[in-house]
Curated annotation (Swiss-Prot):
GO cellular component, one term: DNA-directed RNA polymerase complex
UniProt cross-references to InterPro entries, sorted A to Z: DNA-dir_RNA_pol_omega, Pol_omega/Rpo6/RPB6, RPB6/omega-like_sf
EC primary class: transferase
Native organism: Burkholderia mallei (strain ATCC 23344)
Name the UniProt record assigns to this protein: DNA-directed RNA polymerase subunit omega
SMART domains: RNA_pol_Rpb6 (SM01409)
Gene: rpoZ
Disulfide bonds: none
EC number: 2.7.7.6
Length: 67
């Protein structure tokens, strides 16, 4: 099983703070029942990071957050 690292995700979202926000927001979505964009049996936080590293989700999801 391949391990996910922050460095893999930083290639997609270079700002660590935006990366943390995007991963948190996506992990919450997954925990609430949204469909994952990649196939994985991992916890929502790991799936969120895998999606970011794969380029499936990115910083654009922060612009969708309702105010």
């Amino acid at each position: 099983m391949a391990r996910i690292t922050v460095e893999d995700c930083l290639k997609q979202i270079p700002n660590r703070f935006e990366l943390a926000l995007a991963a948190t927001y996506r992990a919450r979505q997954l925990a609430q029942g949204h469909t994952p964009k990649i196939e994985s049996r991992d916890k929502p936080t790991v799936v969120a990071l895998r999606e970011i590293a794969a380029g499936q989700v990115g910083v654009e999801m922060l612009k969708k957050v309702p105010a």
